[in-house]
């Protein structure tokens, strides 16, 4: 089991996030299992990600000056980061991601675990 670490005002389970913004991910558990989408944002304090097109919720908007009619809109709700996995669009299947070192430039790059190719 992962050790809980203190970050800011809350405890978080994950220190490193292998999934980044604009990555394509696939949901591996829950009612959205098997669906894919692009990561819109990451909440590191709560270990959650917002994925485009997944976990949609209805939000009731009051009339404002910008939106005088108000109404109901659908927005994406956050999903726990353990419920999503990186999706490789080239191979069209899910793939693990690990951080490796690039020897030429000496900086960190992300590589796909099965084929060791840069992402």
UniProtKB/Swiss-Prot annotation:
Gene3D superfamilies: 2.30.30.30
The organism's taxonomic lineage, starting at the top: Bacteria, Pseudomonadati, Spirochaetota, Spirochaetia, Leptospirales
Single GO BP term: translation
Function in brief: One of two assembly initiator proteins, it binds directly to the 5'-end of the 23S rRNA, where it nucleates assembly of the 50S subunit. One of the proteins that surrounds the polypeptide exit tunnel on the outside of the subunit.
Family stated for the protein in its record: Belongs to the universal ribosomal protein uL24 family.
Subunit structure, interactors included: Part of the 50S ribosomal subunit.
One Pfam family cited in the UniProt record for this chain: KOW
Name this polypeptide is given: Large ribosomal subunit protein uL24
SUPFAM superfamilies assigned to the protein according to its UniProt record, in alphabetical order: Translation proteins SH3-like domain
GO molecular function, one term: structural constituent of ribosome
Record keywords: Ribonucleoprotein, Ribosomal protein, RNA-binding, rRNA-binding
PANTHER family: MITOCHONDRIAL RIBOSOMAL PROTEIN L24 (PTHR12903)
InterPro entries to which the protein is assigned, alphabetical: KOW, Rib_uL2_dom2, Ribosomal_uL24, Ribosomal_uL24_KOW, Translation_prot_SH3-like_sf
Entry GO CC: ribonucleoprotein complex; ribosome
Presence of keyword Transmembrane helix: no
